[in-house]
Amino acid sequence: TLAHAMFGLALVQASAHARSSVGEGIGEFVATFVLLFTILGTVRRNSEFTALTVPAAITAGYWFTSSTSFANPAITVARSLTDSFSGIAPESIVLFIAAQCAGALAAWLFSGWLWPSHSKD
């Protein structure tokens, strides 16, 4: 809404930008998977690099996926409230949040398999 105010737009809008294709859903799955896998891997291996790896993953998701990497349900809902190029139509939200949840779960499971915990509890 701050950006809307700066440009003299209505503070809350409903986006008309449909993002409902299967390809965009797959792109959102991939973007979320890569982001969460990057976070989990970096924190596990060397958390000093988190400030570099997370923005790199987000940038890659933006440039190299069909969804432009929302990768977060809160961002998805927020972007439904702008009719700018970055918006998402309200009817597309369910697909994106489902893809984000699936991507996050897949990244968590894969990282757990790749780097098993060796707890002796």
Describe these PLM feature segments.
Residues T1-D121:
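Membrane-interface helix-loop junctions and terminal tails of multi-pass membrane proteins
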